[in-house]
Amino acid sequence: LHSTSRRQRQMCIRDRLASLIFCEAGNQPYEGQVAVGAVVMNRIKSSSYPDTMEEVIYQSGQFSPAMSGWLDRVRANQGYTEAAMQAAEDALAGSNPIGDCLYFSVGGYGTRIGDHLFH
């Protein structure tokens, strides 16, 4: 019973991250999708951000799909792609093409992957 609830919790975390990756980077190269997942994982590890994925993703003013409700709609319908799911799994397993970056944007500075700049 305990392992079932743990597995369900892990699936919930994976689905939440896959949904965010799809919303933020679904039209980007696979490496860019993993990089968005890595930003979330980096924030969880950072003392400057909350300690859980849910708190990081839904922190006020951080990820627009979380604020607009788009993320929740995608998640409710499992509307993310297989690539977004795989990117989430890879990021959760430690894949990180961006080092210690905590942000990404379409303008400004940083390491470019697809249309996003990671910094």
Give residue spans per PLM region:
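Single conserved hydrophobic/aromatic residue that forms the stacking wall/gate
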Residues: L1-R9, I13
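Bacterial extracytoplasmic/cell-wall-associated proteins, especially those involved in peptidoglycan
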Residues: Q10, R14-H119
